Amino acid sequence: GFDTNDAEEEGLRNWVRNIVNEGVTALLPTTITQSEEVLTNALKNVARVVREGYTGAEILGIHFEGPYLDMKYKGAQPEQYIRKPSVEQFKKYQEAADGLIKYITMATEADEDFALTRYCAEHGVVVSIGHSAATSQEAVQAFAHGARSMTHVYNGMTPFNHRANGLVGAAYRMKSMYGEI
């Protein structure tokens, strides 16, 4: 298989060239939570491939999944690299990616004053709530500050309950929100 975090440029080129055989015409290579060094290298690799050219499925940008996640709902994401959302750190990642981060999955309830949520929304990066312990009400607040999506609804988030609707309940209620399954 292929992992955006581990791949060298040639691996990425082979992946996008061959994935069209599976019917994929466009994609967002996705990173997962890792050390700053590993993430920076992965972002630079994708940016270099896009800049130098390739054949195959179109790379629309990068999906940056983590490291701004909730420990309880981290799933397979390595907890030693989970961080609080930081605009300054994200700017460094976006610079390494040559501006290609177009979609970010994060636990918006950990985003103090929704600073990173707002920054991303203002700079054309889709904010998606995922790997999150947010309540339904916190999701509504995140959407008021620019979040637009939920990453893999039902997985890595507060569940639906008749007394506490969680993120799953918010996904059903909010008409302007995109819920990815």
Residue positions per predicted region:
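Alpha-helix N-cap and loop-to-helix initiation/capping positions
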Residues: A7, V38-A42, Q77-P85
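Di-metal (Zn2+ and/or Mg2+/Mn2+) metal-binding site signature of metallo-dependent hydrolases
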Residues: G1-E8
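Short acidic, glycine/serine/threonine-rich loops at helix termini
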Residues: L39-N41, K72-Q77, L116-T117, A139, ...
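Conserved phosphate-binding/catalytic loop of the ribokinase/pfkB sugar-kinase fold
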Residues: D70-E95
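Active-site core of metal-dependent hydrolases
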Residues: E95-I181
